[in-house]
Amino acid sequence: MKALVIGAGGVGRAIANIASRRPFISSMVIADRHLVRAEEAVARVKDSRFSAAQVNAAELEDIRELIRRADPDVVI
């Protein structure tokens, strides 16, 4: 399953941590307004299935574009 998590704060980091222990997650993009924050969340899980992206969640078109690029099965 390909997943996209919007927000790399406490909840986003917790989701990434749990997902890193689930073999059915084939890839997960952690996105945040601040790319550094998303990159830090990815670095914490130390898993090549995870990647970081930048998105302004207040802009619907930004979210749509990220969904097109990431092609996730689920968006959180």
Set out the residue ranges of the language-model regions.
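Hydrophobic/aromatic anchor residues within beta-strands of the central parallel beta-sheet
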Residues: 50-52
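Conserved SAM-binding loop
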Residues: 38-42
